[in-house]
Amino acid sequence: MNHSEALTEQVFSFASELYAYGVREVVISPGSRSTPLALVFEAHPNIKTWIHPDERSAAFFALGLIKGSEKPVAILCTSGTAAANYTPAIAESQISRLPLVVLTSDRPHELRSVGAPQAINQVNMFSNYVNFQFDLPIADGSEHTIDTINYQMQIASQYLYGPHRGPIHFNLPFREPLTPDLDRVDLLTSVTKTLPHYQKSISVDDIKDILQEKNGLIIVGDMQHQAVDQILTYSTIYDLPILADPLSQLRKEKHPNVITTYDLLYRAGLNLEVDYVIRVGKPVISKKLNQWLKKTDAYQIIVQNNDQIDVFPTPPHISYEISANDFFRSLMEEPLVERKKWLQQWQSLEQQARIEISDYLKHATDEAAYVGSLIQKLTKEDTLFVGNSMPIRDVDNLLFDSEASVYANRGANGIDGVVSTALGMAAHKNVTLLIGDLSFYHDMNGLLMAKLNELHINIVLVNNNGGGIFSYLPQKRSATKYFERLFGTPTGLNFEYTALLYDFTFKRFDNLTDFKYAELSKMGSHMYEVITNRDENLHQHQNLYQKLSEIVNVTL
């Protein structure tokens, strides 16, 4: 078997194995060393390829594809520093447990560590962030090479689904010439293989006594596409309030036991005595709720469908590695407890807080008012993707009367890659992106995917000319002299030119009334810039906090 035949057999087999374990989309960043796989993916009849010249943005775009399709997605790049640009998205995928398949092309072994161009040490280069990594052998025509691909793909497949989900990395060295025989498409298969299946039942004997206490809470974070119907059923039967993070997707159910205003209530001084807490899913966004969890004496139970339990903000008394539905189904035989008054107390606080927030939004002109207006425009067909820092916090506080789905990059919580991830989701969903100006600037090149692929997306860009969240931190008061340069970081950019560069329509709003009457587009790529003031935003938010503290004090 000559080199061309060996290369052809190897890359066609590898692509077929990826398909067999569920990969249907690949994001390719063009380069020479990745030629063999790029050509094969393009030739595969049942794998869709996306082309993005920027590796960092491409990797985040793939995360959006994963969120939108609920399937593993692969990324492919050439050798050298191109691969290093994947790191931020891989870190996000690891913490968010997204099945990202990282494929880095490499120089052959004889060109490593000898000063050859475009060659860095790529073996295990993402070891801190991936669940699996393997440096594949070079194509040599040996049957052992194909066996190795099959064995390692089977091992890696356990990380594409189920509780061990997360990123995997294959490093693939290729020797020149790099072109496989594309006439051998008969080697490409579209056969699916049996995927790992996880099914668990548990004993709840250890928490039976705790569950008989009256003052219980269920706190639900990002559920990452898990079914949640049993949480609502259990809450209804046992009269337990559910403090639901916007990423839990529970708020859109409009269930009477779902509490949405808890962040503002705890910020206002809420301090009800709680006997136990069942924490489900990822940690919540709310800093105030996390601070309360850290200091409370309540017995804490964590339920996560993953082998790596996220204990933040404080280790629990007991944890269960099981799906939320299976866990709450296991509790259904426990005796009923009288909790009507406990639940009604939370529902009363929620109702009063919503009234106060709604009244606030009628008169406010700050960023929260724009966010509130945007939420009212969304329907159950819409997906709201939210940037980090202030946008996600405003959504956390104001999302209580919408059927839209809500997503964000809340693994590593970075401001990078937000535009790209939202556009990846836009390939599968009707997406509106809410983002701040610094986060938008950080990932403007991600807009290229909308231009190249005619993706539909609405971008609401909140421009306060800097980092608005820092105004809420101690630096604002303790480092006044240096605050604006080090933390405010104004850029003074005119984003209308960005819209022009990437073929987005653009409209700027400097008053809330005009924005309220604006309609989100149903097709095409559109940017809506709203101009806000950081100091005014801080002042109006503080007024809302004061109003809610009065409610809490009167109620308690």
UniProtKB/Swiss-Prot annotation:
Keyword presence, Metal-binding: yes
Gene3D superfamilies found in the cross-reference section: 3.40.50.970, TPP-binding domain (3.40.50.1220)
Requisite cofactors: Mg(2+); Mn(2+); thiamine diphosphate
GO BP: any one term: menaquinone biosynthetic process
Lineage: superkingdom: Bacteria
InterPro entries with a match to the protein in the record: MenaQ_synth_MenD, MenD_middle, THDP-binding, Thiamin_PyroP_enz_TPP-bd_dom, TPP_enzyme_TPP-bd
SUPFAM superfamilies recorded: Thiamin diphosphate-binding fold (THDP-binding)
GO molecular function, one term: magnesium ion binding
Pathway: Quinol/quinone metabolism; 1,4-dihydroxy-2-naphthoate biosynthesis; 1,4-dihydroxy-2-naphthoate from chorismate: step 2/7; Quinol/quinone metabolism; menaquinone biosynthesis
Record field: catalytic activity: isochorismate + 2-oxoglutarate + H(+) = 5-enolpyruvoyl-6-hydroxy-2-succinyl-cyclohex-3-ene-1-carboxylate + CO2
UniProt cofactor note: Binds 1 thiamine pyrophosphate per subunit.
Keyword annotations: Magnesium, Manganese, Menaquinone biosynthesis, Metal-binding, Thiamine pyrophosphate, Transferase
Enzyme Commission number(s) from the entry: 2.2.1.9
Enzyme class, spelled out: transferase
Its job: Catalyzes the thiamine diphosphate-dependent decarboxylation of 2-oxoglutarate and the subsequent addition of the resulting succinic semialdehyde-thiamine pyrophosphate anion to isochorismate to yield 2-succinyl-5-enolpyruvyl-6-hydroxy-3-cyclohexene-1-carboxylate (SEPHCHC).
Sequence similarity: Belongs to the TPP enzyme family. MenD subfamily.
HAMAP family for the chain: MenD
Subunit structure: Homodimer.
Alphabetized NCBIfam families for the sequence: menD (TIGR00173)
Protein name, UniProt field: 2-succinyl-5-enolpyruvyl-6-hydroxy-3-cyclohexene-1-carboxylate synthase
Native species: Staphylococcus epidermidis (strain ATCC 35984 / DSM 28319 / BCRC 17069 / CCUG 31568 / BM 3577 / RP62A)
